[in-house]
Curated annotation (Swiss-Prot):
pH dependence, entry free text: Optimum pH is 6.0-6.5.
Gene: ugl
UniProt-listed GO biological process terms: polysaccharide catabolic process
Regulation of catalytic or functional activity: Partially inhibited by divalent metal ions such as calcium, copper, iron and mercury.
Subunit composition and interactions: Monomer.
Protein's name in the database: Unsaturated glucuronyl hydrolase
Record's catalysed reaction(s): beta-D-Delta(4)-GlcA-(1->4)-beta-D-Glc-(1->4)-alpha-L-Rha-(1->3)-D-Glc + H2O = beta-D-Glc-(1->4)-alpha-L-Rha-(1->3)-D-Glc + 5-dehydro-4-deoxy-D-glucuronate
Temperature dependence: Optimum temperature is 45 degrees Celsius.
Location (main, coarse): cytoplasm
Residues in the signal sequence: none
Location of the protein in the cell: Cytoplasm
Organism in which the protein naturally occurs: Bacillus sp. (strain GL1)
Keywords from the UniProt entry: Carbohydrate metabolism, Cytoplasm, Glycosidase, Hydrolase, Polysaccharide degradation
Cross-referenced PANTHER family: HYDROLASE, PUTATIVE (AFU_ORTHOLOGUE AFUA_7G05090)-RELATED
């Protein structure tokens, strides 16, 4: 059922390997070509993750060789501390170094992932009880700020805690996850993109947005980060409240999916042709639904409901948004949005959308769960 879609992604990736060389794709800019960078952006781990997924599925050395080169690049980036003053270290190193460890049990990759976890730990602000999202400590705008994306960065810390036996990684990750649950998720199970706290004492100030439509609206990719992020943290922490939050957010999301199965970029905007979609939000959510289902008993009626919803979502992406391996396209799925209000790639390829689309396909086809936790955990 999914093999043709996976084959298209494999073919596109093989071509991209030759085109991109040692550079990393981020988003497209209105064309069918990716804008590349030299491993300086927050999204670069997704390219590495795609290559590891392709290698796991095929055993083809071209994907492995490309993936190993990316890990070497991430080692250099950490040594230089280049554009790492943010919480997305988890995205960057879970899908590169930690992926190599999971696939090959390479000790140097494991050490690199642990070193990256230590860098992420430096962003813990004990007085506020948060992992600061962006900027240096004491930043006047961002010093007490969290964003919902961070839930996908916490698995790097939780994995590091299991690998080393040091409870501090888990303590920090759990504290941040629980504070995110309390303040980022609204009473109706929608979500804020970002929340501000007093950096000196952790008192709540206000919720807001950076990439959503309004402070009070629900940015669909943020909701998707919450669905998958709370589910992943539940797997590590065994916290039923986190899993229940993921389920509630998933129900909220699914109740607002338009007829063709792929969401618009914000739940507040009109569902009409002139509004932008965000295919990446749907791809992330598909992975989150499958992760939730994997933690439910087979007797739970919602388990199959979430699996069916994930299949419906991936089918909608495959049939209405996915590119075919025709020699031209560089992305897997069209109509992703990066920053609509900012006018940055509002209707384009996104490398994270491509990664989660492929992860969802491989979860459905082979049970491959990505690189957020050890296999068989």
């Amino acid at each position: 059922m999914w093999q043709q879609a996976i084959g298209d992604a494999l073919g596109i990736t093989a071509r991209n390997l030759k085109k991109f060389g040692d550079r990393f794709p981020h988003v497209s800019d209105g064309s069918n070509k990716y804008v590349l960078n030299d491993n300086t952006d927050w999204t670069d781990g997704f390219w590495s993750g795609i290559l590891w997924l392709c290698y796991e599925y095929t055993g083809d050395e071209q994907y492995r060789e490309g993936a190993v080169r990316t890990v070497a690049s991430f080692r250099e980036r950490l040594d230089r501390f280049e554009n790492l003053d943010h919480h997305d270290i988890g995205f960057l190193y879970s899908l590169s170094a930690k992926a190599q460890w999971i696939v090959e049990k390479d000790e140097s990759a494991r050490k690199l992932a642990l070193d990256a976890a230590d860098v992420l730990m430096r962003r813990w602000r004990a007085d506020a009880g948060i992992i600061q999202a962006w900027g240096p400590k004491g930043d006047p705008e961002n010093g007490g700020r969290i964003i919902i994306d961070c839930l996908l960065n916490l698995p790097l810390l939780l994995w590091a805690g299991e690998q080393t036996g040091d409870p501090e990684y888990r303590r920090v990750a759990e504290a941040h996850a629980l504070k995110s649950r309390r303040f980022l998720v609204r009473g109706d199970d929608s979500s804020y993109h970002t929340f501000y706290f007093d950096p000196e004492n952790g008192n709540a100030i206000r919720g807001g947005t950076h990439q959503g439509n309004t402070d009070g609206s629900t940015w669909t990719r943020g909701q998707a980060w919450g669905i998958y992020g709370f589910a992943l943290n539940s797997r590590y922490l065994g916290n039923a409240d986190l899993l229940e939050t993921a389920k509630r957010m998933a129900r909220h999301f699914l109740a607002r999916v338009p007829e063709d199965g792929v969401v618009y970029w914000d739940f507040e905007v009109p569902q009409e042709p002139s509004s932008y979609r965000d295919s990446s939000a749907s791809a992330i959510t598909a992975c989150g639904l499958l992760e939730i289902a994997s933690q439910l008993d087979e007797s739970d009626p919602e388990r199959q409901r979430f699996i069916d919803a994930a299949k419906t979502t991936v089918t909608a992406l495959r049939d209405g948004y996915a590119e075919r391996d025709d020699g031209e396209a560089e992305g897997f799925i069209r109509r992703g949005s990066y920053h609509v209000r900012g006018g940055i790639s509002p209707d384009d390829y996104t490398i994270w959308g491509d990664y989660y689309y492929l992860e969802a396909l491989l979860r459905l086809e082979r049970g491959v769960t990505g690189y957020w936790y050890e296999r068989g955990r």
